[in-house]
């Protein structure tokens, strides 16, 4: 919607306004540099599209605006009157053929009676040698062991309204012939189909379109750097937690993790969530007392895990009657693991309270036993004074 609004406002800006506002056109608003830079080869055709005016918009706004081009902030417009390699057509600046000296910043200015803005676009023209491949190549990525498509980019200015597009494809300067079972150039398109992508398919590709102008043939070349990425393999996920029953005290805060083992599988395509009585947590607890925590993805010993916690803040009696499920799903499997919340036994809390009392009784009992033993020992010492007399009397008969 935002893009549509901007386009509508852009079209309305080109509508002629009353002459009373013509002073506004004297100051041009600079809208910045276009995000895309044009990297082209010397000796080939180049078409720079005015960034403010897409091709499909040109037909409707061209009668209402004046479009001019300047180079490197020069006051002189391009192309000049005597320039034969450059011309402006349908909102684009054409250079044929382009030379290295054409490199620079080109500013497109659109103006009517009440509105004026300008925007710049960068052009770099390189010598046509392999040394500049890293600078002029478009990176494209295909997945290993699959079939994919390479696209010859930025040819719309030269292929518009044409149904007989013929493109020749090269890999490392070798022409890919029609009988090649590995590579197939899709007729009438800018696509190259690559069957069963292998690691050795990586490298530089060139697509060449022949363009005719005033009876002369020109080549338009685009270079592509193909990068191969390994296919992300999926495995059957295994839920390793939570436990079947979780004990918690009413009024306490509780976190139950749902941990899933993926092995070497990718977590990107694995979904993990919680339910309560087969209902999503957000619906079962609209007040937000029980929520899902943030998803975590991590590795342990080069094996992948994902985890989503269920958070109670706090636990209430309502939770004791809920059937909670951890649910995991990917293209290979759908699994669930149930858990319930049980009120923690009160025995443990009474034990905590009674433990200090028991210890106190033991201490007091020990003190009492110590004093009693000491008292008995004192009595025993008094008796031993008499024992020698009794022993002498009994041991020696007359």
UniProtKB/Swiss-Prot annotation:
Q: Write down a Pfam family by its short name.
A: ig
> Could you name the Gene Ontology cellular component terms for this entry?
cell surface; cytoplasm; extracellular region; plasma membrane
Q: Which SMART domains match?
A: IG, IGc2
Q: What are the GO MF terms of this UniProt record?
A: interleukin-1 binding; interleukin-1 receptor activity; interleukin-1, type II, blocking receptor activity
Alphabetically sorted, this entry's keywords are:
Cell membrane, Disulfide bond, Glycoprotein, Immunoglobulin domain, Membrane, Receptor, Repeat, Secreted, Signal, Transmembrane, Transmembrane helix
Task: Describe the location of the Ig-like C2-type domain by residue ranges.
Answer: 18-124, 134-223, 237-349
Please cite one Gene Ontology biological process associated with this protein: cell surface receptor signaling pathway
The cysteines covalently paired via disulfide bonds are 28-116, 50-108, 152-207, 258-326
Q: Under which name does UniProt file this protein?
A: Interleukin-1 receptor type 2
**Post-translational changes noted in the entry:** A soluble form (sIL1R2) can also be produced by proteolytic cleavage at the cell surface (shedding) involving a metalloproteinase; hovever, several sIL1R2 forms ranging from 45 and 60 kDa are reported.
Q: What does this protein do?
A: Non-signaling receptor for IL1A, IL1B and IL1RN. Reduces IL1B activities. Serves as a decoy receptor by competitive binding to IL1B and preventing its binding to IL1R1. Also modulates cellular response through non-signaling association with IL1RAP after binding to IL1B. IL1R2 (membrane and secreted forms) preferentially binds IL1B and poorly IL1A and IL1RN. The secreted IL1R2 recruits secreted IL1RAP with high affinity; this complex formation may be the dominant mechanism for neutralization of IL1B by secreted/soluble receptors.
Q: Which organism is it from?
A: Homo sapiens
The segments labelled Contains proteolytic cleavage site in the record are: 329-343
The keyword Repeat is assigned to this record: yes
Q: InterPro entries per the record? A: Ig-like_dom, Ig-like_dom_sf, Ig-like_fold, Ig_sub, Ig_sub2, IL-1_rcpt_fam, IL-1_rcpt_I/II-typ, IL-1_rcpt_II-typ
Q: Which Gene3D superfamilies match?
A: Immunoglobulins (2.60.40.10)
């Amino acid at each position: 919607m935002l893009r549509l609004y901007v386009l509508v406002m852009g079209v309305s800006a080109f509508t002629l306004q009353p002459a009373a506002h013509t002073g506004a056109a004297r100051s041009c608003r600079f809208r910045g540099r276009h995000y895309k830079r044009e990297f082209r080869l010397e000796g080939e055709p180049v078409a720079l599209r005015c960034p403010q005016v897409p091709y499909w918009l040109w037909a409707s706004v061209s009668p209402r605006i004046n479009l001019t081009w300047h180079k490197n902030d020069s006051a002189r417009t391009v192309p000049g009157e005597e320039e034969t390699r450059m011309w402006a057509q349908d909102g684009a600046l054409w250079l044929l053929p382009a030379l290295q000296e054409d490199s620079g910043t080109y500013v497109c200015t659109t103006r009517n009676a009440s509105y004026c803005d300008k925007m710049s676009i960068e052009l770099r023209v390189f010598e046509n040698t392999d040394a500049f491949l890293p600078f002029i190549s478009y990176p494209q990525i295909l997945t290993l062991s699959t079939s994919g498509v390479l696209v010859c980019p930025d040819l719309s200015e030269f292929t518009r309204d044409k149904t007989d597009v013929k493109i020749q494809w090269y890999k490392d300067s070798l022409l890919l012939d029609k009988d090649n079972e590995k590579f197939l150039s899709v007729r009438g398109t800018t696509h190259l189909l690559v069957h069963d992508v292998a690691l050795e398919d990586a490298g530089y590709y060139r697509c060449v379109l022949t363009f005719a102008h005033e009876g002369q043939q020109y080549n338009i070349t685009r270079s592509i750097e193909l990068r191969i990425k390994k296919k992300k393999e999926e495995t059957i996920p295994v839920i390793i937690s939570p436990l079947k029953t979780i004990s918690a005290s009413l009024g306490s805060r509780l976190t139950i993790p749902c941990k899933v083992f993926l092995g070497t599988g990718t977590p990107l395509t694995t979904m993990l969530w919680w339910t309560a009585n087969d209902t999503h947590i957000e619906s079962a607890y609209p007040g937000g007392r029980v929520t899902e925590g943030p998803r975590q993805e991590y590795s342990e010993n080069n094996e992948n895990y994902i985890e989503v916690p269920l958070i109670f803040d706090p636990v209430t009696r309502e939770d004791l009657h809920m059937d909670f499920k951890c649910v995991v799903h990917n293209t290979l499997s759908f699994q669930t693991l149930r858990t319930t919340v049980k009120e923690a036994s009160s025995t443990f809390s009474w034990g905590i309270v009674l433990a200090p009392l028991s210890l106190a009784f033991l201490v007091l009992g020990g003190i009492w036993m110590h004093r009693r033993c000491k008292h008995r020992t004192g009595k025993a010492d008094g008796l031993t004074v008499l024992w020698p007399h009794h022993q002498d009397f009994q041991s020696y008969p007359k």
